[in-house]
Amino acid sequence: ALPRAIGNPMYHWCHLELKNFFGYEGVLNGQTAQQVWDLALEKLAQPEFSARNLIRRSNVAMIGTTDDPCSDMHYHDLLAKSGFETKVCPSFRPDSALNIHKSGFAAYIRKLSEASGICIRGAADVAQALSARIAFFDTMGCRAADHGLDYVMYRQGTMEQIDRAFAKAMAGEDLCVEEVEMYQTYLLLHCAGEYARRGWVMQIHFSCMRNPNEKAFAKLGADSGFDCMAVTDSCQALYRVMNALEREDLLPKTILYSLNPADDQWIDTLLGAFQSSQIPGKIQHGSAWWFNDNKVGMQNQLTSLANLGILGNFVGMLTDSRSLLSYARHEYFRRILCNLMGTWVENGEYPADMETLGALVEDICANNAKRYFDL
């Protein structure tokens, strides 16, 4: 399939990984597949291809894992004691506690109650349990939280309404959209305030259509390759979420990712409405994500951010791949960034000042993220 994927980033990534890690500079196709397979087997048997050595070869300063609030952090504790030079920090992912409308919610709340030591009878108890787990994650070096939302919601409700929705969910009853949104808004604002108090970074991912193919979902389950972009009305709600937090001086450092590139420009104008003179680039437009994680998608995100914001304050690329070879995607990003900046210079839109340009590239690709995540 790979030779037919002309223009697809998978073609670029695969060849970058083969070159950077395995020293293979040929083309992967049906004729070379056995040669590449044999080379990979030979290399992977060598000590320098251990997981830690692959990370060392990529010069990784920090890895942020994705962790459920109920995690006991056992392996993080072992890693911290092992002396591994790359920081491996947990990231708080409380989606299961917020997804009141999804199956398995009641069982998850019982698990959260056990992990936190909080008897959970209502929504305020869920908030207290999450606060307890946030405090624990903080002791383990957590620097960021991540919220995966189908869309951004903002619907205020009374505690009586929110508790009624919670009770219905715990009893296995269906909830209306308004009930789901009131509960999720309450907990999103609560968690964001906790992040702000600790100097964490809040990441919000949205505009994803999950499991549209019911037949495939029934056969293979979630996260099996059938999700897609969504058109969502998240703009007004996100403004209101951020305004509610800013009003109370509880807006944390925030990175926003939309799966729909049509959202790029309004996101980039939103950044300017909530920036801070104390933290350069406090509110970030996250790097082109998932379906946009390709040459054109990256160029479009970078161009929109440059046109409407300050590209020099951007915290740059991340890879959320589970592959230890995926750090090659950072090189992919750097190539695209430098090509774009070089085009602007050649067009006379920026001086050919190599010292300034070099410093900008270093900041976008490394230094800004180090400062932003307090590394």
Model regions: which residues?
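Divalent-cation-assisted or electrostatically stabilized phosphate/pyrophosphate-binding catalytic cores
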Residues: 232-238
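Metal-cofactor-binding active-site regions of metalloenzymes
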Residues: 1-198, 249-252, 256-268, 272-375
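C-terminal amphipathic alpha-helical interaction region
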Residues: 202-204
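Hard-cation-handling environments
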Residues: 208, 213
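Short glycine/proline- and charge-enriched loop/turn segments
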Residues: 217-225
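A short acidic, glycine-rich active-site loop
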Residues: 177, 226-232
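Short, basic/hydrophobic alpha-helical segments
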Residues: 241-247
